[in-house]
Amino acid sequence: TAQDDLKAVFSGNFNQKLEFGGSINYILSRGHYQHQATKDLAYSIFGSYLGDRYDIQFFLNTYNFVNQENGGISDDTYILRPEEVQGGQSSVNTQTIPTNLTDAYNRIRGKEYYATQRYKFGFYQEEEQDTTVIRTFIPVTSIIHTIEYNENKHRFVNQSATEDTTYFANTYLGLGGTNEETRYQSIRNTFGISLLEGFNKYAKMGLAAYATYEYRHFSLPQDTLSAGTTIEGLTPRPDISNPRSHGESLLWVGGEISKQKGELLTYHVNGKFGLAGAIIGDIDVTADIRSRFRLWNDTVQLRA
């Protein structure tokens, strides 16, 4: 068994506010038995701009994963009694052991595109140091928008019609092999408004309220036969009907409270409530609480 792993990452700043980078990862594993190779190619682009009033962060990520399927060993004698099939030799080369499938594979492809942007309202605070006046922007309120797109495809292909009908117990759609694809897509938009932590001496925490709308779409293999249809050589199709495609809309409203400044206690609490779609009535609350303090000559950190 051998595996190759090539990975490269680049990230650089054009100036104090603008950053850009990318990565690529290629993995190839040949497997221990015949028709067991696996490879994955993933690459991404990312960047950010962090200004006084406007911020944006984004990344684009794609991957393409292919896995050969051999269906397992077709003759256990090669493992249990190898001398019977190798002219008396007890040692066996695993790459010569026959498998159930010789021309089949699974392919999974995916994309994830994400961007979040924020516009901040606030004021500039001036501080004089020696003969220089330093202006520092103090954000008070911000408007937030986040967009996320996901797409995932799964395809199973078996190009051997003979192995397709002998290996699988049931064959419903055709006798010429298998080529089936399922797909999932979603796009999510979030709009929110927040009061930023520390904009004045009484603001001990940050507050945010938001609404999220998501549309999901599912695509399944096309039925080529009607229910109850029987063709010679095929397994009679069950009397069920699945939609070729299906879409659904989801809507959440939620809020956050957070405190990230200081060491004694920091926390982040997020809660959202489902208003429409399959998640209507759902309540989702996540929290992260941390504490750090000195104890004698050491530092104690607690997290929950």
Descriptions of predicted regions:
Residues N100-T165, A169-A304:
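Exposed, low-structure sequence patches enriched in small/polar residues
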Residues H32-A42, F46-R109, L295-A304:
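Outer-membrane beta-barrel translocator/channel fold
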Residues T1, D5-I27, F46-S48:
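Predominantly transmembrane beta-strands of Gram-negative outer membrane beta-barrel pores used
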Residues T1, F20-H32, L264-G277:
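Transmembrane beta-strand segments that form the barrel wall of outer-membrane beta-barrel proteins
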Residues A2-Q3, L28, H35-F46, Q185, ...:
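Short, glycine/acidic-rich beta->alpha junctions
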Residues G21, I56-F59, S142-T146:
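A structural signal for short, well-ordered beta-strand segments and their strand-loop junctions
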Residues L28, R53, T62-V66, F123, ...:
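Short loop/turn segments at secondary-structure transitions that flank enzyme active sites
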Residues E19-G21, G87-V92, I257-T266:
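Active-site-adjacent bridging/hinge elements
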